[in-house]
Swiss-Prot record:
Subunit relationships: Interacts with chemotaxis (Che) proteins.
Magnesium among keywords: no
KO phenotype (gene knockout): Mutants are unable to switch the direction of flagellar rotation. Flagella rotate only clockwise, resulting in exclusively forward swimming cells that are unable to respond to tactic signals.
Keyword list, A-Z: Chemotaxis, Repeat
HEAT repeat ranges, renumbered to this chain: 7-41, 42-78, 90-127, 153-184, 185-215, 216-252, 370-406
GO molecular function terms noted in the UniProt entry: oxidoreductase activity
Listed Pfam families: HEAT_2
Descriptive protein name: HEAT repeat-containing taxis protein OE_2401F
Organism for this UniProt entry: Halobacterium salinarum (strain ATCC 29341 / DSM 671 / R1)
Coiled-coil parts of chain: none
């Protein structure tokens, strides 16, 4: 049987369903349910397996199945698993009223499901009954899901109640409250999150740090920079992600000063996890502005020899990027790092057949900033060999900077 990690990557619904139904380990069944909830296409048999798992002997598996069905927005299936019917009315507010009533159910699973669906529906008027439920609910699993729902409804009026949940509550409730505060992004929410960035729990610090990245202001930057020195690699990486996110969202008049502050502090850390996180954002990020900022930063915080080669390799692979700014930032980043390693890496782009004309042109540009005699000689040959006007233009310009004949 493949590992759960492998199944998560492959999205093998059949194998996940088999684990959910037949594994003797509740941790495996729970994780299988979570993975099914995250799939783009869980298929009908995956949904049905989650419905069946709502009757699992283990409470954590039942809760995971409820969350997974909510993640898939499979409200009909969710209610079927609880022997309930979805309200016939097509109006969202009418459905919401019915689920608010379910918050009073004696069955914890139904209260969990009700909270989840209310978060999914996002009806503002349900924030008040959810907040009331959070203050009176005794079941930890239900409390956690109510806190989550309040964040998804995004009503600032509930900020104070969520801040109160950051302290003196079970960890799962505290983390859901922290994540919800990141959605609200009020001043009170910010103050609350800043109060737990040094929490004893690694998981709590990581959640708080991640939530701070949602604020479109420079205020969390100092706290996030401090977390670059956290003892936990996961917290440090979350801090990098949040700093990039803030940098991508702050007003332009604050951007330059912030960049310099963040670069100075990241460079001082010389931490491999920072480089790894930046490369991950570049490789896997879905937002262009995040990838641009991470590329720009990578060349300026490359650090010592332990991390420098990873940064050089990542930037080299971006020289032919379709986005002109990313390609430009990659070239200037390599120039910022400088040295023989960068020159050798750039010459490989010019000398092999693995790279397209755009990458070769940007490599020639960068060689004009970091190259020596061997680069000048290779660029002079490139001028004669290439059929690309852009490559020739970049090579000519680089040769002139290196003191060669043009």
């Amino acid at each position: 049987m493949p590992s759960l990690y492998g199944l998560e990557r492959s999205g093998d619904v059949e194998k996940l369903v088999e684990l959910l139904q037949e594994s003797e380990k509740e941790t495996v069944r729970r994780r299988a349910a979570e993975i099914l909830g995250n799939l783009d296409e869980p298929e009908p048999e995956g949904i049905q397996a989650l419905v069946d798992a709502m009757s699992d002997d283990d409470e954590s598996v039942r809760a995971a199945a409820i969350d997974a069905l909510t993640q898939q927005e499979a409200v009909d299936a969710l209610m079927r698993g609880l022997d309930q019917e979805v309200p016939d009315s097509g109006a969202t507010w009418a459905q919401a009223e019915a689920f608010v009533e379910n918050l009073e159910s004696e069955t914890p699973e139904l209260r969990m499901a009700a909270a989840n669906v209310l978060g999914l529906l996002g009806v503002e008027d349900t924030a008040r009954p959810l907040a009331k439920q959070l203050q009176t609910e005794e079941h930890v699993g239900v409390r956690a899901r109510v806190a989550r729902a309040l964040g998804r409804i995004e009503q600032p009026a509930v900020t104070g109640i969520l801040v109160d949940c950051l302290h003196g509550e079970p960890l799962k409730v505290r983390r859901e409250a922290a994540e919800s505060l990141g959605r609200l992004t009020t001043e009170q929410a910010l103050d609350g999150l800043l109060s737990v960035v040094e929490d004893d729990s690694e998981a709590m610090r990581r959640t708080a740090v991640s939530s701070l990245g949602r604020f479109e202001t420079a205020e969390p930057v100092d706290a996030l920079v401090e977390r670059l020195g956290d003892e936990s690699d996961l917290v440090r990486r979350a801090a990098v992600f949040s700093l990039i996110e803030i940098l991508s969202n702050v007003p332009p008049d604050q951007s330059h000063e912030l960049r310099e502050t963040i670069v100075d502090r990241m460079s001082a850390r010389s931490d491999p996890s920072i480089i790894k996180s930046l490369i991950e954002i570049i490789d896997e990020g879905t937002q262009l502005h995040q990838r641009r900022n991470a590329t720009w930063m990578l060349g300026r915080v490359a650090g010592d020899q332990r991390t420098k080669m990873d940064a050089i390799e990542a930037l080299r692979e971006l020289l032919g990027e379709d986005d002109d700014l990313i390609a430009q930032f990659a070239a200037t980043g390599l120039a910022e790092i400088g040295g023989a390693s960068v020159e050798t890496s750039l010459l490989e782009v010019v000398e092999t057949q693995e790279y397209g004309e755009d990458a070769v042109a940007m490599a020639a540009f960068a060689l004009g900033k970091v190259g020596g005699d061997r680069s000048r000689q290779r660029l002079e040959r490139l001028v004669d060999e290439t059929d690309s006007e852009e490559v020739r233009r970049r090579a000519f310009s680089a040769i002139s900077k290196l003191g060669g004949k043009t």
